[in-house]
């Protein structure tokens, strides 16, 4: 237990005891605004002001004065009440305070991860989502099995609070955290509904991301600790290892089960394989290994019991699916990924005899998933369920260039993200749908036909839907009538956000 605490950096001297008074500092709300996800904390809603949104520190001053005059909890009571409170509704002030509070509780985490953040700043390319795919291409082609893991949502509210207690020792801040959680509709249930999480994340994006990341950090840190202990397994008994890693005493029941069932073999099987790899994006993770199917089943058993006994979370075993990489493709993230066997024939000769050798090379393949992308286009009303392009309604004062730029920007974003796929025919189909939908939208606006629009704006439409790479290729080989179906994939190290239509995993 002491070693686990040391690994996680749980030191009382690093805990923050005086965070609550920071809620009364104007600079905290300014920082929350500058570094916020949507930059909305200091902007008054239109329904409150009646004129355009403008950044205003006057709102913050009013809030702080009211917080000094009254109890903070009185301000937050009935946060959804639309009655006016100092000229604004209570939910607006509640959101401001929650965003400011999220900025405050990030302080201990920032101090703890200072060294890691410095390393990340030096390796700017590692921030790109595409940086994970070269790793998958290099490692996964030699592995046998993969587990698709849907990380359960944090459930019991007190578990979130207890997790943050390892970083924050300020009692008023923890009470305020409980107040935020228990005061939100549908957050007082044992198992948090996905709909409630989606609603909460939209209303308080920064606050939600901090809570979720702290939960995932706790889960992954213990797994990393266990994996690092594997180098000592050959010098100690599995029983002693189980005694040392009892997960803060919360997994005593799990350890009893492990001692009774797999005392001799489980932990050795879990960690003796050096080819176990783990990757995560948002709420989905994959774990792949060169080991047997039995090894992956034991990992699945371990994870399910860990979630149940450490986070008091009843996780269905169906959230972890084990498949062979050789005949299974998995979504991660925005790609359909799997192992493809490239057959090849080698001609050999010994003295006067020649012979042919059939062989195959494993390659990690990334495919653009057509069905989820079509579903995203249907949801955005670019086409029907059969993939047939349809027109979109536009404002009467929208110019042709604005409409074309809008469609072209979506097309370029999708092409940019899916540039790593070696098979582009699915992507070309999506681009065709967007281009024809754009033409139909223009025809609807001008009350004309698609053929007339294509004749009038044909070259302009074509150029807008070309990527930079395709423009260069068109200049080099202008006679090429259609793009090749197979080409080398390109990974861009400047992508830090997935377009909504690409994030269908």
Swiss-Prot record:
Main location: plastid
Keywords: Chloroplast, mRNA processing, Plastid, RNA-binding, tRNA processing
InterPro entries given in the database record: Domain_X, Maturase_MatK, Maturase_MatK_N
Coiled coil stretches, renumbered: none
Location within or outside the cell: Plastid, Chloroplast
Annotated GO CC locations: chloroplast
Gene Ontology process terms (BP): mRNA processing; RNA splicing; tRNA processing
Transmembrane segments: none
Pfam families: Intron_maturas2, MatK_N
GO MF annotation terms: RNA binding
Family: Belongs to the intron maturase 2 family. MatK subfamily.
Biological role stated in the UniProt entry: Usually encoded in the trnK tRNA gene intron. Probably assists in splicing its own and other chloroplast group II introns.
Protein name listed in UniProt: Maturase K
Record organism: Illicium oligandrum
Organismal lineage: Eukaryota, Viridiplantae, Streptophyta, Embryophyta, Tracheophyta
Gene field: matK
């Amino acid at each position: 237990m002491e070693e686990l605490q040391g690994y996680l950096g749980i030191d009382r001297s690093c805990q923050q005891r005086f965070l609550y008074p920071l809620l009364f500092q104007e600079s905290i709300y300014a920082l929350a605004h500058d570094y916020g996800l949507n930059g909305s904390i200091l902007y008054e809603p239109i329904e409150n002001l009646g004129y355009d949104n403008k950044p205003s520190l006057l709102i913050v001053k009013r809030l702080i004065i009211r917080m000094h005059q009254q109890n903070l909890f009185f301000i937050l009571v009935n946060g959804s009440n639309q009655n006016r409170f100092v000229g604004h509704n209570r939910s607006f002030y509640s959101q401001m305070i929650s965003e400011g509070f999220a900025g405050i509780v990030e302080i201990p985490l920032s101090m703890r991860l200072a060294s890691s953040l410095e390393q990340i700043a030096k390796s700017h390319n590692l921030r790109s989502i595409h940086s994970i795919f070269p790793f998958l291409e290099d490692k996964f082609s030699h592995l046998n099995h993969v587990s698709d893991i849907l990380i359960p949502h944090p459930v019991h509210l007190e578990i979130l609070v207890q997790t943050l207690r390892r970083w924050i020792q300020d009692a008023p801040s923890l009470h305020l955290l409980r107040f935020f959680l228990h005061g939100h509709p549908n957050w007082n249930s044992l198992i948090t509904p996905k709909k409630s999480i989606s609603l909460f994340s939209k209303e308080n994006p920064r606050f939600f991301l901090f809570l979720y990341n702290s939960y995932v950090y706790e889960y992954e840190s213990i797994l990393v600790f266990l994996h690092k202990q594997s180098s000592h397994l050959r010098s100690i008994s599995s029983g002693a290892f189980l005694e040392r890693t009892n997960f803060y005493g919360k997994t005593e029941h799990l350890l009893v089960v492990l001692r009774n069932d797999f005392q001799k073999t489980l932990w050795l099987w879990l960690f003796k394989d050096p080819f176990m790899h783990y990757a995560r994006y948002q709420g989905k993770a994959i774990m792949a290994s060169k080991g047997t199917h039995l090894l992956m089943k034991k990992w699945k058993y371990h994870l399910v019991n860990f979630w149940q006994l450490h986070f008091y979370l009843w996780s269905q075993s169906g959230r972890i699916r084990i498949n062979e990489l050789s005949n299974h493709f998995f979504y991660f993230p925005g790609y359909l990924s799997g192992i493809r066997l490239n057959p090849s024939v080698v001609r050999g000769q010994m003295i006067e005899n020649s012979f042919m050798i059939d062989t195959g090379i494993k390659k990690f393949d990334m495919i653009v998933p057509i069905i989820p992308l079509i579903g995203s286009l249907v949801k955005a009303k670019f086409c029907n369920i059969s993939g047939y392009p349809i027109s979109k309604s536009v404002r009467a004062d929208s110019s042709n260039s604005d409409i074309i730029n809008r469609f072209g920007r979506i097309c370029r974003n999708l092409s940019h993200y899916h540039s790593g796929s070696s098979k582009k025919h699915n992507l070309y189909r999506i681009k065709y749908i967007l281009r024809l939908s754009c033409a139909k939208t223009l025809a609807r606006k001008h009350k004309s036909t698609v053929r007339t629009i294509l004749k009038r704006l044909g070259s302009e439409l074509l150029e807008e839907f070309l990527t930079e790479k395709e423009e260069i290729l068109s200049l080099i080989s202008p006679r090429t009538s259609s793009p090749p179906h197979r080409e080398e994939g390109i990974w861009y190290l400047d992508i830090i956000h997935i377009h909504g239509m690409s994030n269908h995993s």
